[in-house]
Amino acid sequence: MMAAGAALALALWLLMPPVGVGGAGPPPIQDGEFTFLLPAGRKQCFYQSAPANASLETEYQVIGGAGLDVDFTLESPQGVLLVSESRKADGVHTVEPTEAGDYKLCFDNSFSTISEKLVFFELIFDSLQDDEEVEGWAEAVEPEEMLDVKMEDIKESIETMRTRLERSIQMLTLLRAFEARDRNLQEGNLERVNFWSAVNVAVLLLVAVLQVCTLKRFFQDKRPVPT
């Protein structure tokens, strides 16, 4: 009964919405993803706030456009250039530990004068929890009930499951980006194949007509017929 009561209390705590504490700091930074169209000859920058002493992972892919490449730079809140890449199709970079402030991510398509690029990028922060949040749900269980339930094992299992689920979501997002890039590439190839196939058919028809006309001329008797 005590173990059942502990499990019920744990389930109720997990279903309850988080309650803010008076004077608490700003909400934690959330992971994010974004897909945008970068015009030819343009540069576009984004700013992302980051807490201190955390881990920031940046992943990007060019999923559309001729060449599938772009220039990428990443700057710290102090203006220090952390990453600089030229004509890359994708990249993964980790900043650890982070500084408190706004990180600057720039994508540059200035080298292209005609082709626009479809760019996907994702920002992943480490999932750090305050000690109060980690220990908060343990307080929902009476001390005597904790004797029958291995609270540390439960916390460890939940944390492992949450981490794996978050990583699974991130991997699915990247797979969607890969799929979008491959689909755009295949659609572009299909358009080129259809165009040149139509050109070849038109040339074949033209050659066939010319051959028929030429043969008909060979067999035409243009000599005058005596009367």
From Swiss-Prot:
Short motif (COPII vesicle coat-binding): ranges: 218-219
Keywords: Cell membrane, Coiled coil, Endoplasmic reticulum, Golgi apparatus, Membrane, Protein transport, Signal, Transmembrane, Transmembrane helix, Transport
Stored SMART domains: EMP24_GP25L
Motif (COPI vesicle coat-binding): 218-227
Annotated GO CC locations: endoplasmic reticulum membrane; endoplasmic reticulum-Golgi intermediate compartment membrane; Golgi apparatus; plasma membrane
Topology of the protein relative to the lipid bilayer: Single-pass type I membrane protein
Residue ranges that the UniProt entry lists as topological domain Cytoplasmic: 216-227
Complex and partners: Homodimer in endoplasmic reticulum, endoplasmic reticulum-Golgi intermediate compartment and cis-Golgi network. Interacts with IL1RL1. Interacts with RNF26; this interaction is important to modulate innate immune signaling through the cGAS-STING pathway.
Role of this protein: Potential role in vesicular protein trafficking, mainly in the early secretory pathway. May act as a cargo receptor at the lumenal side for incorporation of secretory cargo molecules into transport vesicles and may be involved in vesicle coat formation at the cytoplasmic side. Plays a positive role in IL-33-mediated IL-8 and IL-6 production by interacting with interleukin-33 receptor IL1RL1. Plays also a role in the modulation of innate immune signaling through the cGAS-STING pathway by interacting with RNF26.
Name under which the protein is recorded: Transmembrane emp24 domain-containing protein 1
Gene from which this protein is expressed: TMED1
